[in-house]
């Protein structure tokens, strides 16, 4: 049972959704990234996804503002983050109010597989 307010039953598993969100960024790297680069990119995508969910659904913009602060990131980093924010707010992902909690990349038969857990950004009712 979903604890999310949208109760959108069309949502796929969060791991599938997150992979679809991340894939264009991985593909833009040209060749398959090394494990370190891949993990760094996943961490950035994870942070942007969650910051946008908090900003758009809870009204908490401090996390997104920090990610977009040019004094805390390189110009290329800000461009990447802006692109990810735009992608999260695109028609494909905008109605997904799930936070991405823990995630892991596992190797299954030589293929990387993404596992992720979803959680609600909304405060629990007392």
PLM regions and their residue ranges:
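Short terminal alpha-helical segments
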Residues: 6-50
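Amphipathic alpha-helical interaction segments
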Residues: 26-29, 54-57, 62, 101, ...
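Extended non-catalytic scaffold regions that mediate assembly and binding
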Residues: 1, 5-13, 64-67, 112-118, ...
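Extended low-polarity, hydrophobic cluster-rich segments
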Residues: 17-22, 41-58, 75-89
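Amphipathic alpha-helical binding modules
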Residues: 75-126
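Extended intrinsically disordered or low-complexity segments
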Residues: 60-78
